[in-house]
Regions:
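Generic enzyme active-site microenvironment
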Residues: 12-13, 211, 248
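P-loop NTPase motor domains
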Residues: 21-30, 36-38, 44-243, 259-261
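Short, glycine/polar-rich helix-capping loops at beta-to-alpha or helix-loop-helix junctions
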Residues: 16-22, 255-266
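Glycine-rich phosphate-binding P-loop
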Residues: 1
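Short beta-strand-centered segment that lines the nucleotide-binding/catalytic pocket of NTP-utilizing
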Residues: 6-21, 35-36
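A short beta-strand-to-loop transition that corresponds to the Sensor-1 phosphate-sensing loop
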Residues: 16, 247-252, 278
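A short helix-turn-beta junction within AAA+ P-loop NTPase domains corresponding to the substrate/partner-engaging
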Residues: 28-33, 261-276
Length: 278
């Protein structure tokens, strides 16, 4: 139905994602399979290029927020999902390390520093997780847990995520992350959602839909308030970007398991259509 209406569609499937593959192939879409040791990668560190032309026509040209600051804010959420017990000291060390990592690539809070060629609108090459790992290794103290966690992305089973984004973009995209388990599933699901949301915000005049299966992974007890707030924000404001957000879950108890169901209730309240199957 979305295809007939030429609505760009993104499907995030943390469980049984393979069920979408045949349909995706028949529609000449992009089926992205994430797995330990696999090939597909979304660079967690990438600051993605925005197309603000439609926004400028609608709203005029205003002062832009620092893209680096926004990205670092998102990376704090990513790492909080991997290390739920991260201390305030580790959080501050991570913040400093992230700024230093981007500085090594010439990227600062000045958005102009993102461009390799301003005239052509091309962005600079972005750092990857091993760059952050190397910066943390050089810091004197307080980085042990951060380095141990990052080691798996640099030298371990998730080293496939230590590279530039290599996904073919299309009008119909399926992200299968069913081979990922534990805290890595929640963190990668957040990374995929961030990537999709950035794509969805590129052009407010273009219709699009974000479909998130098993959304409790991001708003339930396995997640945290930071990630859940971002998910809720998407459901609140996606219409302002010409989009729709669709969530699915098999167990409403999981849906309401974080902070007394605050985020699950918020999503339901922002959904015009609710379908309950028994």
């Amino acid at each position: 139905r979305f295809r007939e209406k030429k609505i760009q569609t993104f499907i995030i499937a943390p469980d049984k994602g393979h069920e979408y593959k045949r349909l995706c192939d028949n529609m000449n879409g992009t089926y992205v399979k994430f797995s330990p040791g696999g090939c597909a990668c979304i660079n967690v560190m990438e600051i993605r290029k925005k197309d603000d032309s439609a926004n400028h026509v609608i709203d005029g040209v205003g002062r832009e927020a620092s893209e680096l600051a926004l990205k670092i804010q998102s990376l704090h959420v990513f790492f909080s999902l991997l290390i739920p017990t991260m201390t305030a000291e580790e959080d501050q060390i991570l913040d400093e390390a992230l700024i230093l990592t981007y500085e090594k690539y010439g990227i600062t809070h000045d958005n102009a520093s993102l461009y390799d060629d301003v005239a052509e609108g091309t962005y600079k090459k972005m750092p990857v997780l091993s760059d952050l790992y190397n910066v943390l290794k050089e810091m004197p103290e307080g980085t042990k847990r951060l380095c141990l966690m990052l080691n798996r992305f640099v030298h371990g089973s998730f080293a496939s995520l230590n590279q530039q984004t290599n996904i073919r973009e299309s009008e119909y995209m399926v992200f299968d992350i069913s081979d990922i388990q534990g805290e890595f599933l929640t963190a990668l699901m957040y990374t995929v959602l961030e990537y999709v949301y950035a794509r969805a915000k590129e052009n407010r005049t273009k219709k699009k839909a974000i479909i998130v299966d098993e959304i409790w992974e991001l708003i339930g007890s396995k997640s945290n308030a930071k990630a859940a707030e971002i998910v809720l924000e998407i459901f609140k404001i996606i219409r302002g970007y010409g989009g729709a957000a669709i969530a699915a879950t098999q167990d409403l108890n999981d849906f309401f398991s974080l902070e007394d169901g605050k985020y699950g209730k918020g999503i339901i309240n922002n959904c015009k259509t609710k379908i309950v199957l028994n």
